[in-house]
Amino acid sequence: MITEIFKKILLFYVIFYKKKCINNSRKFVKDITQCPKLKPRQTPPKSVHDLRIDDIKVIMAIGDSITAGFGAKGHHANIPIDIHNLHENRGVSFSIGGDPGAVTIANFIKHYSPELIGSSTGDHLVELCYGLICPPYQYKPKKDRFNAAQSGMMASNLTIELNYLLDQLYKEPMEVVLKSYKYLTFFIGSNDICFRCSNDLPWLTSKQFEDYLKSTLEIIRREIPNTVVNLLGVFNVSQVYNFHKEEYCKGWGLVAEYECSCAFAPGIFGTLNRKKMDETSMEYNKAIRNVVDYYASHKSDSFAVMYQEFDIDLTTFPVEGLSNVDCFHPSTKSHDFITKIFWNNLVLPASKRGGRIEWEDNVGIRCFEENDRINTNIHP
């Protein structure tokens, strides 16, 4: 009897430690350069649903000021009107920045795929497109490359970004356009949320938002084959309000109030506005999920839409996670953090990519293995 009990206990420990060893076998590092390169594939990918990270040869992005990297490096003088405070730091943008040493998805992919093209680099004066205020000829292709994001961008203006992206992409050899595998980060909605608190305009409804997303994705599907789109959810932008009580943010409130007046209105009106913003975020996330489900039910070998929740809990973030230009946009510190979270999620099943994102110090960077694939399946 005792022998049988001992055997069962021993078996339990063997299974437990074996499972633990398997779970811990995945390598996480502090710097992407510490990850070993992958051996070349023996056979080419069967479709966009069979991609290793080193199969990606083109990186692209559509979005707003966050993707443009506005204010990420912080202000350069103690006066708000310093011209450098109006710069987009595109080279450190979490999704597509290509500055040497920057912690970005683009640079992580380039570690495995050195011939990657499309990363944005450097800094330049803000490119503004906000509703009807959308001047032409702002793009700087030598720095922007395939980062089509513009500060202030709303879903109703997405065709402007898409036209720029198509124009730049089709300057490449047709081999690149038609056959190379591409990865596009699509992140939009924050400015729509910031504008909707007191404006029930038809072009800000969740239904119209969904239509804008789908029409944009349809053009991408038709015009940019062999593309995986990572469609990000929206987060509760209203959370930034609480940071403006911090000493770090004093003196810059007027800038943020201009950027998102709904979030910073005082008193009962401010409370109601922020509630409306959060409700809009929920509606928009449902719309985003509807779009993702649509493409999951219309599966294609040359086009896929992934879904990445962006449910960040800003109350867990250090105040330095916001840019000291306006205490509204993410700083390089937050760009780095989000990069690691989204990178680590790329090969995970959909059921493990969601959940509340809380701040962690020293997040490790996942090293991809030869059997890892970018997980395009949106269902658990």
What are these regions (language model features)?
Residues 70-75, 121, 158-159, 195-200, ...:
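Short, solvent-exposed loop/turn and secondary-structure capping segments
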Residues 77-212, 218:
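Conserved SGNH/GDSL esterase-like catalytic core that processes O-acyl groups on lipids
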Residues 182-183, 187-300, 309-312, 340-345:
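Extracytoplasmic, non-cytosolic globular domains
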